[in-house]
Curated annotation (Swiss-Prot):
Binding-site residues for Zn(2+), renumbered to this chain: C278, C323, H324
Record keywords, A-Z: Metal-binding, Zinc
Role noted for this protein: May play a role in signaling. May be not involved in abscisic acid (ABA) signaling.
Species per Swiss-Prot/TrEMBL record: Arabidopsis thaliana (Mouse-ear cress)
GO terms, biological process: carbohydrate metabolic process; peptide modification
Record protein name field: LanC-like protein GCL2
One Gene Ontology molecular-function label: metal ion binding
UniProt keyword Ribosomal protein present: no
Protein family (similarity comment): Belongs to the LanC-like protein family.
GO cellular component terms, A-Z: extrinsic component of membrane
Lineage of the species this protein comes from: Eukaryota, Viridiplantae, Streptophyta, Embryophyta, Tracheophyta
Outcome of gene disruption: No visible phenotype under normal growth conditions.
Length: 405
């Protein structure tokens, strides 16, 4: 597969028509009324959901090798959870809990503590699903297990394996179960440790906060500044801490590439290559949009919109997934649509989703699009595409899984 992305030859805007037929099938999807397209996406999502469950749960004999939400079986449970939210089908919630139970057993001895790649994801999703299904004993069990998670002193701070990945799980639980289910003192303690380490590492540079993961100072959502700032903005910060978060994001804006894209790390400031959620403009655009909401400063919204232009032009990736694929990049436009109400952003999300709906299966089967090392997983594979399609049913409720609350 030469090149990282498909040339985006889709029109900047296509007016919707009540009746479309013949000609280019992708163009027809772009012209289809949103209400009709969203139902088509929903049907495709539910079909994909069944395939994902069969491939990750049925064919495995209901055994779990990789329990994580990112690349493993818990991702299927999270997709079922989202399907339940969209359709109200209680069978999806029941199966979600069944899969979480198996993941609970498989992860019992895991030292990983985050939502996406660790024990907190299992216990967090288990608690929320149990709450929604009215199973009080099971809810208390998962909350009890969550409270047993301990953060080591040498834990990194990033989203996939570090402190903010644990913190996000706390916030997820409190959103669905109740504000003080996990105490604000617990959350503050973790946030303060993150800020303390960020300030310590930043002493030699221009950014108020800086973090390191395996020897590199990453900027992106998965391992770096964008992901850490994003989660911290959902926590009650002291004024000086909030200023440091704001200043860190302004440092990133000031040091972006002329193209509007962002370096993957401090060490990669000359490499304008990646346009992924994990590294580059997409994940950072989501964080800047969040900053506009939290701080009320137009600079952040303008920077998010500029990053979205990069995603539109270079983000039609030759990968399907949420982490580094088209599915994840579509969330940039959904977030900006929520923030601005501008139809052009909904159209762009619709365009990326329509491209996947129309051409994704064929491109995957021909090897012209990469399905990821775990092809049915949430963050690398087609489960992420199904999740996006479900989120397209009601764009006002769309949230990047494991990142936006």
């Amino acid at each position: 597969m030469a090149g990282r992305f498909f040339d985006n030859v889709m029109p900047d805007f296509v007016k919707e028509k009540e009746s479309v037929s013949g000609g280019d099938t992708l163009r027809n999807l772009l012209a289809m009324p949103y209400s009709s397209l969203s139902q088509q996406l929903k049907r495709s999502a539910l079909d994909l959901k069944e395939t994902v469950v069969i491939e990750t749960w049925g064919f495995s004999g209901q055994t779990v090798e990789d329990f994580t939400l990112y690349s493993g079986t818990l991702g299927a449970a999270f997709l079922l959870f989202r399907a339940y939210q969209v359709t109200g089908n209680a069978n999806d919630l029941s199966l979600c809990l069944e899969i979480v139970k198996a993941c609970d057993t498989a992860s019992a001895s895991s030292g990983d503590v985050t939502f996406l790649c660790g024990r907190a994801g299992v216990c967090g999703l288990g608690a929320v699903a149990a709450k929604l299904s009215g199973e009080e004993d099971l809810l208390n069990y998962y909350l009890g297990q969550f409270r047993l998670i301990r953060l080591s002193s040498d834990l990194p701070n990033e989203l996939l394996y570090g402190r903010v990945g644990y913190l996000w799980a706390c916030l997820f639980i409190n959103k669905y179960i109740g504000k003080e289910t996990l105490s604000s003192d617990t959350i503050r303690e973790v946030a303060q440790e993150i800020i303390k380490e960020g300030r310590s590492m930043a002493k030699k540079g221009s950014s108020p906060l800086m973090f390191e993961w395996y020897g590199k100072r990453y900027w992106g959502a998965a391992h770096g500044l964008a992901g850490i700032m994003h989660v911290l903005m959902d926590v009650q910060l002291k004024p000086d801490e909030a200023e440091d978060v704001k200043g860190t994001l302004k440092y990133m804006i000031k040091n972006r590439f002329p193209s509007g894209n962002y370096p993957a790390s401090e060490e990669d400031k000359k490499k304008d290559i990646l346009v992924h959620w994990c590294h580059g403009a997409p994940g950072i655009a989501l964080t800047l949009g969040k900053a506009a909401e939290v701080f009320g400063e137009r600079e952040f919204l303008e920077a998010s919109a500029a990053a979205a232009e990069v995603v539109w032009n270079r983000g039609l990736l030759k990968r399907v997934g949420i982490c580094h694929g088209i599915s994840g990049n579509a969330y940039v436009f959904l977030a900006l649509y929520r923030a601005t109400g501008r139809s052009e952003y909904l159209y762009r999300a619709k365009a990326f989703a329509s491209f996947l709906l129309d051409r994704g299966p064929k491109l995957l089967s021909k090897g012209e699009m990469h399905g990821g090392d775990s092809p049915y997983s949430l963050f690398e594979g087609v489960a992420g595409m199904a999740y996006l399609f479900l989120d397209m049913v009601d764009p006002s409720e769309a949230r990047f899984p494991g990142y936006e609350l």
